[in-house]
Curated annotation (Swiss-Prot):
Residues 338-396 are annotated as: Disordered. This is Flap endonuclease 1. The lineage of its organism: Eukaryota, Fungi, Dikarya, Ascomycota, Pezizomycotina. It is found in: Nucleus, Nucleolus; Nucleus, Nucleoplasm; Mitochondrion. Pfam families: XPG_I, XPG_N. Mg(2+) 1 binds at D34, D86, E158, E160. It comes from Phaeosphaeria nodorum (strain SN15 / ATCC MYA-4574 / FGSC 10173). Interacts with PCNA. Three molecules of FEN1 bind to one PCNA trimer with each molecule binding to one PCNA monomer. PCNA stimulates the nuclease activity without altering cleavage specificity.
């Protein structure tokens, strides 16, 4: 689910944080991809009759089809993908997962009814809601990635947190996920829409956390941004009814921390009421110190290798009944691209030099002066406008 309305807030307050571009702009970059989110998106790409892609024997193959061809597309555009799978969910998330399972059970019953009485739109809508990524889906995807020579890791808990750790540790350029809580886990750069199909013609969104914080007037070192995300609504806690994005931002700006916000709500319960059990400090700690594999651990020493073409044919063609020509052509292309992947973009050769504290202070001072000058000018313009209005008109 991620963080409710966070993207909307970023669009309003930090538009400079979002860059849009084509997939080819990511050439030469290593990217950590939230595998579970990607697999889910492949599974919900149902056909017009509400059914997923299946083999001749009735097995679902949407996840394998999506993973194989989207990965080929990324490698074809010079990207080095690595996939991160979810581990066990944190205890706080179990309540949210139970609710999701209940919603899917209800949606499954509604989908069956829609097939009998509903429109095509009803069938598709409810079919999407019943989709669940299973252990078997994950195992098959990991088997496919191994045969393709694409590295992967199973996170101790949340895939998004592990992706963020790898990006922060310099193992990859960015974390790729549709879940906005990847930013809450402190990834410097988040890529969205990277695993979308080419037919959707959606641009790749590149969101820079430092610019997000700048627009929201928050510091990276303080947990204000995390507190804002929890208040907006995250996977760990029930949302507070009546708090939308604008209210959440105002509350955090006025009261600085969730402790301050909670005290304010408890002092006047006529307007807002906290859920009965709302352990926000535990949720904050999960974002601040998630259970992850450190970026410098041996498990995070990733290698991209040549694909096992015959192994791919055996798995995808013989077992899953994919078209052999398409699989062989894709595997040959993958092999060729892996060989030429040594060519890297300039960022790999020229590491950015860290600014000195004096340079940082100078830049901040200049930015503050610029802002002060802008406010002064606006004030003078407003004053002149007011004076012009108050002047009596002379008779012509």
């Amino acid at each position: 689910m991620g963080i409710k309305h966070l993207y909307q807030l970023i669009q309003e307050h930090s538009p400079d944080a979002i860059k849009t571009g084509e997939i080819k702009n990511q050439f030469g970059r290593k990217v950590a991809i939230d595998a579970s989110m990607s697999i889910y998106s492949f599974l919900i790409a149902v056909r017009s009759d509400g059914q997923q892609l299946m083999s001749e024997t009735g097995e679902t193959t949407s996840h394998l089809m999506g993973l194989f061809y989207r990965t080929l597309r990324m490698v074809d555009n010079g990207i080095k993908p690595l996939y991160v799978f979810d581990g066990a969910p944190p205890k706080l998330k179990s309540g949210e997962l139970a609710k999701r399972f209940q919603r899917k059970s209800e949606a499954h019953a509604a989908a069956e009814e829609a097939k009998e009485t509903g429109t095509a739109e009803d069938v598709e809508k409810f079919s999407r809601r019943t989709v669940r990524v299973t252990r078997e889906h994950n195992e098959e995807c990991r088997r496919l990635l191994k045969l393709m020579g694409i590295p992967f890791i199973i996170a101790p808990t949340e895939a998004e947190a592990q992706c963020a750790t790898l990006a922060r540790g310099g193992k990859v350029y960015a974390a790729a996920s549709e879940d906005m809580d990847t930013l809450t886990f402190n990834t410097p750069i988040l890529l969205r829409h990277l695993t979308f199909s080419e037919q959707r013609k959606e641009p790749i969104l590149e969101i820079h956390l430092d610019k997000v914080l700048e627009g929201l007037e928050m510091e990276r070192e303080q947990p204000q941004f995390i507190d804002l995300c929890i208040l907006l609504g995250c996977d760990y806690l029930d949302p507070i009814k009546g708090i939308g994005p604008s209210t959440a931002l105002k509350l955090i700006r006025d009261h600085k921390t969730l402790e301050g916000v909670v005290a304010h709500i408890q002092s006047d319960q006529k307007k807002l009421t906290l859920p009965e059990d709302w352990p926000f400090a535990d949720a904050r700690q999960l974002f601040l110190e998630p259970d992850v594999c450190p970026a410098d651990a041996p498990e995070c020493d990733f290698k991209w290798e040549a694909p096992d073409i015959e192994g791919l044919v055996k798995f995808l063609v013989e077992e899953k009944h994919f078209n052999e020509d398409r699989v062989r052509n894709g595997a040959a292309k993958l092999q060729k691209n892996m060989k030429s992947a040594q060519q890297s973009r300039l960022e790999g050769f020229f590491k950015p030099v860290e600014r000195t504290p004096e340079e940082k202070a100078s830049l901040k001072r200049k930015a503050d002066e610029k802002l002060s000058e802008k406010k002064k000018k606006q004030k003078e313009e407003a004053k002149a406008k007011k004076q012009a209005k108050s002047k009596p008109r002379t008779a012509g």
